[in-house]
């Protein structure tokens, strides 16, 4: 954050990148037995993001200076030698007043993370966070809570450790509201009573931008765990969508976009009306032109709004504008920022008339072959959105050519899968070309292919996926694990869809 302040890295809540995978009932702990290459790669991304999150939590707990001192002592003590994890915790123990070793043992040797519920009488209970309908083995953690709460008109702060299923903090019984995650550095989820949530939202400016985003992300997670309803999430979302900070508004837009799995033929018109009414004015205010004065948060907000509205607003004017931007980018790839250009290409190709798809495809591929910069190539080829059989097969065939590197081959297949609500065309092509595709992709991508390509929220798509992978999953090392993850994530999405579709429809109807 010192070298590149424009990236606003300090405002990013890194644990959000770990929470989703770490909530799965099939997740493995960071510290696990490794016997093969797939064991190394299994959960590799989670290990890094969870590890970073835990270290950030420790730094926040003991202070940056003490954290640096502990890390420097650790590096000096073990210079040119080998270490184990306990060596780092021991070094940090020596510069802090906390038993970090005990805390780390649970976080690294157990899968998952805790959910802390704070009752109005000051009773705190912890359980293992899990998604709706999932069955997991319950665990407990030693959890550092950095509390912020309002009592008798004063905002107070304190740090407490809870390591039991139930803990009572009498001081919280008198609180108007409680926020248990100061500066949003904790690796846990939390919930409070509805009355306290209302009071917190009424005093939301007592929190900084990280904390505001954490409230929203936390309630979206509670919805996915079936701990709260759609109305609670929308209450938080609507409050933060009015914030003055573009980073906070962007968080609200991002959470709203996560409800896209509930958008269907029956409610898409109501959803489009909501977007045009509440969010199109904001995009119009920002415009689709990037200026030198725009900071990173404004740029990201514009890109996210444009993507959401372009996908779901069904706005003819926005489509027309997107076609112009896409053609401008194809003529001169330096004339439009890649974030805007990619969305424009997606909207233009998605809304292309029957008979125009081939022309769009050929023009984009021609520009792709001429382009020299990798980011330009990616913007061009991975933004295409076609659903007709001929062009879908052209996109997939392109993945097998020398124009697409082995490392990027799977991403074209992923793009096609995400474009299609019905995966019939995808598996028709895969059945004919699986040998060539699997031979071209790196082994790591072969093992992860089910997870990335075939995870779905459709029972019909999952049935096709299971039929496709059944004869080959044991042939390729690690693929069976990828199938397990695909099945778990797909079934979870379908459970959420079943649980919340009616509530989401009711929310949309209330907005009409």
Predicted regions located by residue number:
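Hydrophobic alpha-helical and helix-loop surface patches within well-folded domains
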Residues: 1-137, 152, 258, 262-285, ...
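Long, ordered, helix-rich scaffold segments
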Residues: 15-23, 44-50, 125, 134-138, ...
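Short polybasic amphipathic segments
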Residues: 143-149
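Short proline/glycine- and polar residue-rich coil/turn motifs
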Residues: 162-164
